[in-house]
Amino acid sequence: MKNTNKNNVNRREFLKTGAAITAATILPRWILGGAGFVAPSNKVYIAIVGAGGQGRTNADALMREADAEIVAICDPSEDADYSPFYYGGRAGRLPVKARIEAHYTKQKPDFKCKEYEDFRVMFEKEKGIDAVLVATPDHVHAVVTAAAMRLGKHVYCEKPLTHNIWEARQIAKIARETKVATQMGNQGHSGEGIRMTCEWIWAGAIGKITEVHAWSDAGGWAKGPGRPKETPPVPKGLNWDLWLGPRDYRPYHPAYHPYNWRGWWAFGTGAIGDMACHNLDPAVWALKLEAPISVEASSPGVDSEVVSQCAIYRYNFPARGDMPPVKVTWYDGGLRPERPEELEEDQVLGGGGNGILFIGEKGKIMCGGWGGTPVILPQSRMDEFQKPPKTIPRSKGHHRDWLDACKGGPQPSSNFEYAAKLTEIVLLGNVALRTRKKIYWDHENMRAKNAPEAEKFIKETYRKGWEVA
């Protein structure tokens, strides 16, 4: 539903009707929440910012929801070849626009999806959009997300929520102020596996947990050291300066766009930023983790420009209520924890190159990637375990929950308050890696007690016109 004065009038008339409500009535958010909330019976009109592989994937997911309509697509790149990469095929605003129009013209033959290079121009012209899905490279997440929320738009932002810790705090603050519906794109958070893991742990399935190991084989997107020396021409249809966004100008190189930006500190956050929002998520939720006391990281090589090919990160978290202190270790780039002796010979550690392992006083819980398919080790303990009641509300789907929130339903479970905390924990690991120090973290003041040089990684600088505000 587009934001129109008619809806405001309807809301005022409803509130003036004494027969409609009593003092004890609880009204849905779409009535009380102002023009930003969409009536449950209406469509949610959405703009997508970022039309790469993940933007295309999100568009497909939204097109499966009957009450969502993608009305605008924005990306500095018209068209790019993703066939050498995970996503395959082509992406960019023109291929994704064509995909969107092919879908909606089946119901509305005259349907047209608007296209834009610059999200700021789109926000100025497309006043009727209700919500924004952000699937840009990491370094632009916070800039677009903050601007959209300030305009009263509901926002779904891909993970990690931000590129640095200061941005995570700002985005959480703006979300609290604007009260829009928010969701980060760590899709496993809406899965059954992560809910089962939490419920089992809270029921004492493996007793007190003092150690967690999580991992992903992801990594190795860029090769260093330093920036590329070559300066090839910018491909036709790519606005390179716009793609750089808040970052200082540097010459175009295919090592950055369309895919391998993940391996450059200026644009990406490495494998831990890309995958720990999935695979560490069960630990943060189940163990009620907040700020760590300290974090340290090690890697065969640390470069000022290129993300390490592989690394290990070690976090120390304090006790939380009746939960004891816990050590959390993250591995990426093919590094793994030691294989548990309780695993059967034919059992895989985790699943698909990803996983998480909880070590408790009475046993272990192992999950695959995204917190999926939890099992208790050893198998004998799994066989005798009486599964507890399902106490966590089940999700209808990651995008579905967000759309329902846009219509006045409850905030999704990976809303920006939670997502900012998870993102901050993840990104603090990169601060330790880049400073090459064990960081003692002052959470309240957002600083590394023993490493003033970490400040430039905690809060980055921005080109004029690209500030997070």
Regions found by a protein language model. Name each.
Residues 65-68, 173-181, 203-207, 287-291, ...:
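Secondary-structure transition/capping motifs at alpha-helix termini
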Residues 154-156, 162-237:
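A contiguous active-site-proximal alpha/beta segment in oxidoreductase catalytic domains
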Residues 15, 59, 74, 97, ...:
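Non-transmembrane alpha-helical segments in soluble domains
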Residues 45-49, 70-75, 133-134, 156-157, ...:
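Structural recognition of the beta-strand scaffold that forms the well-ordered cores
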Residues 32, 196, 208-417, 423-469:
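Contiguous beta-strand/loop segments that form the cofactor/metal-binding neighborhood of enzyme cores
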Residues 57, 91, 95, 118-121, ...:
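Extracytoplasmic/secreted proteins, especially bacterial periplasmic and envelope-associated proteins
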Residues 116, 135-141, 161-163, 167-168, ...:
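Short, solvent-exposed turn/loop segments enriched in Gly/Ser/Thr/Pro and often Arg
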Residues 2-151, 169-181:
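N-terminal glycine-/serine-/threonine-rich beta1-alpha1-beta2 phosphate-ribose binding loop
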